């Protein structure tokens, strides 16, 4: 296996990185994982140590000596993109707006477009009523708090962490 990444990354790297991240994001097993434990659990070929190094460099995990755990942004991204079965109506609504706003900003960034103002976001969703605007504004605040978007001077853009998560989780 190659030790150096190409600018686009290797398919083998993306496969093991995704497998390691999915293991850490599994709702039933979210806890710190030892490097050896990850290697024993995964059936995907590849270098777990290098995968953990790449994931840490992308700020998708945290490391303490031999232990690794998914970063808050990765956990929140995973929560947002999961089905909403069994959630309360208010949680379902929150998740809907979080997902819609994040997908809009990710699509914009994939197309090479720059940041979007709050007004442009409202217009993109056809938010003419105050209630809808507040829901979008709250979603922007939650996404910023989770580290999935960056906001400066009233403009929002998907963070590098969110772009990398989107790239990894949609192979």
What does each of the following model-derived ranges do?
Residues 29-42, 111-125:
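Short acidic, hydrophobic short linear motifs in intrinsically disordered regions
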Residues 43-57, 128-145:
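Short amphipathic alpha-helical interaction segments
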Residues 10-17, 66-86, 154-171:
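Short, cationic-aromatic polyanion-contact patches
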Residues 16-18, 35, 48, 73-74, ...:
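Short amphipathic alpha-helical segments that mediate assembly, nucleic-acid/protein binding
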